[in-house]
Amino acid sequence: MAGASLGARFYRQIKRHPGIIPMIGLICLGMGSAALYLLRLALRSPDVCWDRKNNPEPWNRLSPNDQYKFLAVSTDYKKLKKDRPDF
C-alpha cells in the first residue's frame, strides 16, 4: 500500500466503495462550475482591468444598455437611457 501510486489507491477505493462515484461526480461538477464562473467574472466584469494603459477605467466606457450582470430579472437593458455624465 505504501508503494502504490495515488491513482492506483484511488481506483481501489472506487472499486471497494462504488457509492462514492456520484459524490466525486458532483464535486467535479461543482469545481468546474466555480472555475467557469471565475473565468466569466475575469473576462466580462467591468470591475476587472486587464489593460491599464489603453483602458484604465473600463466601467466608464459601458453604455447604459450593456448587460454585465449574470441574471437580470426585471430589467430590460435595451430601453435604458444614459443618465450620467461623460468623464
From Swiss-Prot:
One of its GO terms (cellular component) is respiratory chain complex IV. Pfam families: B12D. It comes from the Eukaryota. Coiled coil: none annotated. InterPro entries: B12D (IPR010530). Belongs to the complex I NDUFA4 subunit family. This is NADH dehydrogenase [ubiquinone] 1 alpha subcomplex subunit 4-like 2. It comes from Homo sapiens (Human). The lineage of its organism: Eukaryota, Metazoa, Chordata, Craniata, Vertebrata.
